[in-house]
Amino acid sequence: MRGLRKRGCLFLVGGVGYSLLEIRWRRRTHWTMAAAGGLCFSLLYGLCGKMAGRSRWKKSVAGSTVITGVEFLAGCLINRRLGWGVWDYSRLPGNVMGQICLPFTFLWFLLCLPVTALCDELHRREGRCTLSQAVVR
């Protein structure tokens, strides 16, 4: 149950956090962006755990790749298959099918810099808590 609760919390933090960021940036959001944000934050948390000891910029490059991949898959489903038209990058440079583009991949990299720091801190605290719980037992 702890694993499920932790995953749910990560998903919620990512979903709410990204939705608020998008509202600030675009003045609107869509519920699917909360789902994508939750998935991305959960994946970034796992990525930071696997890349422990690596530099923040390497984690951020990997993170922006993960986010761009999620964005592409979500865009193919949400915008192209379902036709909901949540976003369209077709006028931006380096776009692929209007679903992802180079400028936003760079923005995801910049966003990943503080997010990977947060994930690293969460991992550090989780390790500290686990160790202290083990000592008490």
Show where each model-derived region lies.
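Aromatic-rich, lipid-facing transmembrane alpha helices and their immediate juxtamembrane interface loops
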Residues: 1-137
